[in-house]
Regions:
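GNAT-family acyltransferases
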Residues: 1-130, 143, 188-193, 197-231
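Glycine-rich acyl-CoA binding loop
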Residues: 133
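Conserved GNAT acetyl-CoA-binding A-motif
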Residues: 146-156
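Conserved beta-strand-loop-alpha-helix junction that forms the acyl-donor binding cleft
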Residues: 155-164
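Conserved active-site tyrosine of GNAT-family acetyltransferases
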Residues: 167-168, 195
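Conserved catalytic-core motifs of GNAT/GCN5-like acyltransferases
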Residues: 174-188
């Protein structure tokens, strides 16, 4: 650990301390899905199905927002999402069906510290636990580390939201700890669990994703031959 002229330990100097970029992308193309900057004109009809018409009410338990009560409320929400720069919202289009089956965002975007959070994840049941869902996360991670030049990628969730925590760890996030009494929402107290991936971990994690997503990792029934954690 380096020392300053007072003989105090300090963090390592950075070869590049410039700020990261703000997200500004229309399309990230993958083998199983595309990740598209969310717009009302392109995505409202498909999103309406899993946000309202056939929404799963239990999916909103750990979200700060409540379930939508009308089509107009969904439209207004998506209009806000389209205009927002922080968070910056994306739609996930599954190539198998051609339909948008999920949304997520880059949020808590902090260019000065080159830190950003993955959040606001809402997936239709038909997208959950699929290659397309995993690839969408991979595509956005790649964009964050390789195009935006960020150092830290965060994931946070209610400490009681085990599916979210399990998803984070499967995707390669490291558990960092728990912020107790971190928030109040829906009249409840929330402890928040924090996870992260840092830039030095990305090259190895990228290889894991690419190996797992390769067509030869899946049999004729679409079942994985090796899990993501096995790579």
């Amino acid at each position: 650990m380096p020392l300053n002229h007072y003989q105090q330990e300090v963090g390592p100097s950075l070869a590049d301390a410039s700020p990261g970029k703000m997200p500004d992308v229309a399309l990230l193309e993958g083998r199983y899905c595309s990740v598209e900057h969310l717009t009302v004109a392109e995505h409202y009809k498909d999103i309406l199905d899993f946000y309202f018409t056939n929404q799963i009410l239990s999916d909103w338990t750990y979200m700060y927002a409540d379930p939508f009560e009308s089509e107009e409320a969904v439209r207004q929400c998506l209009e806000d999402y389209e205009q927002s720069q922080n968070p910056y919202f994306f739609a996930i289009r599954a190539k198998a069906s051609g339909k948008v089956l999920g949304t997520f965002s880059l949020m808590a975007i902090t260019p000065k510290n080159r830190s950003v959070e993955m959040g606001r994840v809402i997936l239709a049941p038909t997208l959950q636990k699929t290659r397309a869902a995993t690839e969408a996360q991979y595509l956005l991670m790649k964009y964050v580390f390789e195009d935006l030049n960020y150092r830290r990628y965060e994931w946070k969730c209610d400490s009681l939201n085990r599916p979210s925590a399990n998803a984070a760890m499967r995707l390669g996030f490291t558990y960092e700890g728990r912020f107790r009494n971190h928030a109040i929402y829906k009249g409840r107290s929330r402890d928040t669990d924090w996870f992260s991936i840092i830039e030095s971990e990305w090259p190895a994690l990228k290889k894991r994703f690419e190996n797992w997503l390769a067509p030869e990792n899946f049999d004729e029934k679409g079942q994985q031959r090796r899990s993501l954690r096995d790579y």
